[in-house]
Structure formats: C-alpha cells, structure tokens
C-alpha cells in the first residue's frame, strides 16, 4: 500500500491512498484522512509532493 503526503492549506496533511487499501490504514491515520470517500481522488495527484 502506498500513502503519499500532500501539503494542503497551511501545514495540514492529507493522506491520499493509491491502491485499494484504505482498510489497511491504522485508525489514527484514517482520522486524518478526509478524502477517503472521494471517487475522484486521483485528480489530486497532480498536486502531490513526493
């Protein structure tokens, strides 16, 4: 499973999951992952900071 960090507004971090493995992410990480329900999450990849 690959989790990438994306800088978003100030110092907030949004976890974007690539690979259908959301259920494998620890609960404390899921709590910080507001985009888990986005079907178009791949559209954010252009703004990723690797």
Curated annotation (Swiss-Prot):
Keywords: DNA replication, DNA-binding
GO molecular function, one term: DNA binding
One of the GO biological process terms: DNA synthesis involved in DNA replication
Top-level taxon of origin: Viruses
Free-text function comment from the UniProt entry: Involved in T4 DNA replication. Binds to ssDNA.
Protein name: DNA replication protein repEA
Organism: Enterobacteria phage T4 (Bacteriophage T4)
